[in-house]
Amino acid sequence: MLREILDVLQDDPSSQRRWFHDDYFDLFVRQTAGELAAFELCYGIHSSERALVWSAGRGYFHDGDPLEADPIIGRFERASYGLPEVLRLALSARLREYILRKAEVPARRTRFRRAAWQQTGGKQNPKDQSRIS
């Protein structure tokens, strides 16, 4: 089950970054006024790590090898049971939308790279490095 990592560096007073983690997923979200504004759902292990990225106004991107959406999303929905309900429902809606639009979603790059704040527990200065902006 995903657990929240606390003390994540906050770089924008108008929004909140949050980080949830388990043994398979890292979920990075940005919320504005409590609403989901962006997320990165990172999954896989080490060299095979991939990410599904969404942000309002930009839409979806997928980093890494092509996504077999149904098993990943099913696994995520089981892991997300402990997330705050409003966030869990918003993420679930976005993931279902992704499944419906999958053919239209471009890949940004073939290998996923984390931003500095996502590698260190969020305590470094992420200026100009965060993909969730």
Go through each PLM region and give its residues.
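Generic preference for hydrophobic/aromatic residues in regular secondary structure cores
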Residues: 1-2, 18-20, 27, 59-61
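Intrinsically disordered, low-complexity regions
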Residues: 3, 16-17, 69-73
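Amphipathic, interaction-prone secondary-structure segments
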Residues: 11-51
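Mixed-charge, Lys/Arg-enriched low-complexity segments
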Residues: 55-127, 132
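Short N-terminal edge-element motif at the start of the domain
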Residues: 1-14
